[in-house]
């Protein structure tokens, strides 16, 4: 007797638009949506806080030694998993209907995003490592000069070496490799969330936390930019271009003025707006497009 033919079984994620449009009921749908969005908001708050703590404290607190070196080298180890978690919380990584579907050149969308993120993470870690190593070398040379001032007269080239580590590796090469990696990571996150729609935020508390995440993202861009050579000019152009693109994109899909319907994209747009305001205030305060060292602040 011929065996009964069974149609292939498909597993649907109840958050996906496809499962909702098919009318698949879920008694836990509302709670799951709420918890899912809460997780994203928490990540959007915690991630910039961690990066700010690791990047800003050494600027205002002058501490040397092994503890300071470990502190600086720890930043990518902590921040990169948080950055990755933001991306993998998107429905691209959680909707089972997306699994195995060819996206481009034989890669699934998840595979493409993982490769994309890893390229950014590699640059981010390399830049952070180069920056931290240059600081160690700079402090070591300064300590030698302080202990033996006569060495500069005997070996004037030591000033050139110090300049190379401070301005060549720390302030320019390390900073910009680090920043390019962060930009690539952020673009991977935005690409992962480009089609994703959320239920929106229905409480004042949730709205304030969500806005706080965007403000922190903007503070990160604004405060870090003033550390870079020509950083204020670079970030001014960057946030204007990317912010304009996000504005047009969200406006096109009628999500620009909603409360969290495009949770991540709107949060980043808030951040770029805050960063733009910070940089404009900075330029006005220092009377020009200067970084922190050029302005003579906290040097």
Predicted features, each with a name:
Residues 160-187:
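Hydrophobic alpha-helical transmembrane segments
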């Amino acid at each position: 007797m011929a065996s009964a033919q069974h149609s292939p079984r498909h597993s649907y994620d109840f958050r996906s638009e496809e499962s909702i449009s098919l009318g698949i009921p879920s008694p836990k749908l509302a709670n799951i949506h709420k918890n899912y969005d809460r997780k994203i908001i928490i990540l959007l708050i915690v991630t910039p806080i961690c990066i700010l703590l690791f990047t800003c404290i050494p600027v205002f607190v002058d501490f040397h030694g092994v503890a300071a070196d470990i502190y600086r080298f720890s930043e990518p180890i902590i921040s990169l998993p948080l950055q990755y978690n933001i991306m993998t919380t998107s429905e691209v990584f959680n909707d089972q209907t997306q699994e195995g579907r060819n996206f481009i050149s034989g890669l699934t969308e998840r595979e493409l995003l993982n490769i994309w993120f890893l390229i950014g993470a590699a640059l981010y870690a390399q830049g952070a490592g180069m920056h931290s190593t240059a600081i160690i070398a700079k402090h070591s040379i300064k300590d030698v000069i302080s202990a033996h001032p006569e060495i500069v007269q005997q070996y004037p080239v030591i000033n050139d070496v110090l300049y190379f580590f401070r301005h060549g590796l720390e302030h320019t090469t390390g900073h910009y490799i680090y920043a390019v990696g962060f930009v690539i990571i952020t673009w991977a996150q935005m690409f992962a969330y480009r089609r994703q729609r959320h239920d929106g935020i229905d409480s004042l508390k949730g709205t304030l936390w969500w806005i706080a995440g965007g403000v922190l993202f903007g503070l990160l861009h604004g405060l870090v930019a003033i550390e870079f050579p020509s950083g204020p000019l670079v970030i001014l152009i960057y946030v204007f271009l990317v912010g304009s693109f996000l504005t047009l994109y969200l406006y096109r899909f009628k999500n620009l003025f909603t409360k969290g319907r495009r949770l991540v994209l709107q949060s980043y747009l808030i951040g770029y707006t805050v960063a733009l305001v910070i940089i404009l205030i900075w330029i006005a305060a220092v009377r020009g497009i200067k970084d922190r060292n050029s302005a003579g602040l906290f040097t």
